[in-house]
Amino acid sequence: MAVVAGLRAFGVKWPSWLRRNPWAPLSAGFCSPGSAGPAGSESEPRLTSTRQQDGIRNIVLSNPRRRNALSLAMLKSLRSDILHEAESEDLKVIIISAEGPVFSSGHDLKELTDAQGRDYHAEVFQTCSEVMMLIRNHPVPILAMVNGLATAAGCQLVASCDIAVASDKSSFATPGVNVGLFCSTPAVALGRAVPRKVALEMLFTGEPISAQEALRHGLISKVVPEEQLEAETMRIAKKISSLSRSVVALGKATFYKQLPQDLRTAYFLASQAMVDNLALQDGQEGIEAFIQKRKPIWSH
């Protein structure tokens, strides 16, 4: 719990749902595409596949037949995969990608009919919100690798990630208004990623924007040709994974903590973080390595 303890000492508050023992280990088949969830329930199949190597965890939305819809089962699988050994020093970066031509079509509308009932609907949206908040509060950077269409909650997922790399064939939309369900929860992430008027046009019309438009408005970080997507995403991930985990974790937490503050408060928080950073073993190691003209040897 060292990372969490350190961030708490810095003043980062983890949401209540993250305090409900989210760090419990998953089943032994974590890296198997067909493994069960944390409870091993047959009724909640895992719809994601994962692999981890050299500090980089790849989480793949693996239900292309359903356009990688963020059903409740998919959301629970994604949440488990993100939380799995989140404090392990071996984990440096997470990449979220998808099988098939659609990154994610958003919520499964078949789960949102009257037949499921209000309580079920509330669980779907609460679980989705938990996943998005988890991405924000996770100690390691989380990247989206997008190749295709990302709509509604799928667009929300992209907007929630720390970095997003997309192929030039990708597009993004919040089309819920067209089926009578305004994308209110996707609007939370979208409205914090793009200018207000851009977000509202997307929300009011449901019309898609291209990858280049998404880049121009700040929804994504980079656009590359489809054949270069994986290589470019991995290049970024490998660079991050080569750095100090504790320094990056502190930096990520500080960035999001200061962002909504007024300028004076933001600088106060950031100044505190710089002092805390210098107190880290890796903070001193990096400075000493620079002075001695050698590569730093990070503690993790």
UniProtKB/Swiss-Prot annotation:
SUPFAM superfamilies: ClpP/crotonase (SSF52096)
One Pfam family, short name: ECH_1
Modified residues (N6-succinyllysine): K110
Gene Ontology biological process terms in this record: fatty acid metabolic process; positive regulation of cellular response to insulin stimulus
GO CC annotations, alphabetized: mitochondrion
Gene3D superfamilies: 2-enoyl-CoA Hydratase, Chain A, domain 1 (3.90.226.10), Lyase 2-enoyl-coa Hydratase, Chain A, domain 2 (1.10.12.10)
UniProt transit peptide range: 1-66
UniProt-recorded Gene Ontology molecular function terms: enoyl-CoA hydratase activity
Subcellular location: Mitochondrion
Region (Disordered), start-end ranges: 34-53
Domain of life: Eukaryota
Cell inner membrane found in the keyword field: no
Keyword annotations of the record: Fatty acid metabolism, Lipid metabolism, Mitochondrion, Transit peptide
Signal peptide bounds: none
Function of the protein: May play a role in fatty acid biosynthesis and insulin sensitivity.
Entry similarity comment: Belongs to the enoyl-CoA hydratase/isomerase family.
Record's protein name: Enoyl-CoA hydratase domain-containing protein 3, mitochondrial
Lineage per the UniProt record: Eukaryota, Metazoa, Chordata, Craniata, Vertebrata
